Every structure is written in C-alpha cells, then in structure tokens.
C-alpha cells in the first residue's frame, strides 16, 4: 500500500521527468532487452535495436500508462484495468517481465536524475512499480 509520503514522492519524481517520459520508457525497454534477452520473445515483430522507432513507440506507451497511473494513485486497478486485460488475456506476458521492466525503469530514472533519486524516492518508486505490476497481473488468476 502506498503511503501519503510515497504518493508525494512518486508525483514529484514523475513531475521532474516531464517531457522525457517516452524517452525514458524507450531507454528502459532497450535496457531490458539487452540485459534480459528472453524478454524479446514478446516482440518478435519489433526491431529491438537501439533507437528503433518501434521501441520508441512502445516506450511512449509504457510511459503514458505510467503517467496515467501516477494520476490515479488512489485507484490503480481502475486506471489500469484495460491494460491488465490486454496483458493477461491477449498478450499473455509472463508476469516476471513486469518486475524486470520495473527494475530497468528504476535504473533509467536513477541514471537521469541522480540527485533526486534519494533512498526514500527509490523506495516509493519501487513500491509504485510493484503496485502497477500487481495490478497488471491481477487478471491472470
């Protein structure tokens, strides 16, 4: 459960990302594909090379979904319901991949905003990504 302080940390951290959210989403995807190559199996139709338009496009989708979630921290299940259905029933993404992408997002954000990435912000963002992952996998059952 996200505390009031977590919600503040998340909103402030995401606010500092500003117009770079899509760029950071793509960078996190590239990092995931490189570090965890088995994740590429869910994107056989993608050019997963550095800087590809498809990775950039999907990175923007990831970032937009997270931006939506940040705007609905009190109702993540409602905000992410359609995405949960998509990933569980159509795409059938292995739930472990959400954790892998979450880790890559944390690394990407820490790399771009080291001064703002305090232990408290790190913990809050980690809880947020874990909450998003839980919601996205909730309809697998």
Swiss-Prot record:
Its job: Involved in oxygen transport from the lung to the various peripheral tissues.
Modified residues (Phosphothreonine): 8, 108, 134, 137
Binding annotation for heme b: 87
CDD domains, A to Z: Hb-alpha-like
Region forming the signal peptide: none
Residues found modified as Phosphoserine: 3, 49, 102, 124, 131, 138
Family, similarity comment: Belongs to the globin family.
Domain of life: Eukaryota
GO biological process: hydrogen peroxide catabolic process
Modified residues (N6-succinyllysine): 7, 16, 40
Name of the protein in its database record: Hemoglobin subunit alpha
One of the record's GO molecular function terms: oxygen binding
Keywords associated with the record: Acetylation, Heme, Iron, Metal-binding, Oxygen transport, Phosphoprotein, Transport
Complex and partners: Heterotetramer of two alpha chains and two beta chains.
Domain Globin: 1-141
Modified residues (Phosphotyrosine): 24
Modification type N6-acetyllysine: residues: 16
Annotated binding of O2, by residue: 58
Tissues and organs where the protein is expressed, per its UniProt entry: Red blood cells.
Entry's Gene Ontology cellular component terms: blood microparticle; haptoglobin-hemoglobin complex; hemoglobin complex
Organism expressing this protein natively: Mesocricetus auratus
Pfam families found in the cross-reference section: Globin (PF00042)
């Amino acid at each position: 459960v996200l505390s009031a302080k977590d919600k503040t940390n998340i909103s402030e951290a995401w606010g500092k990302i500003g117009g770079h959210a899509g760029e950071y989403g793509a960078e996190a995807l590239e990092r995931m594909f490189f570090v965890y190559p088995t994740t590429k199996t869910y994107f056989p139709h993608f050019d997963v090379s550095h800087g590809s338009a498809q990775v950039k496009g999907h990175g923007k989708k990831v970032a937009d979904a997270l931006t939506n979630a940040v705007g609905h921290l009190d109702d993540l299940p409602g905000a992410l319901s359609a995405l949960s259905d998509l990933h569980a029933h159509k795409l059938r993404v292995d739930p472990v991949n959400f954790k892998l992408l979450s880790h890559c997002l944390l690394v990407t954000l820490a790399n771009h905003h080291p001064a703002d990435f305090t232990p408290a912000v790190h913990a809050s963002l980690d809880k947020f990504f874990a909450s998003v992952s839980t919601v996205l996998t909730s309809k697998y059952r």
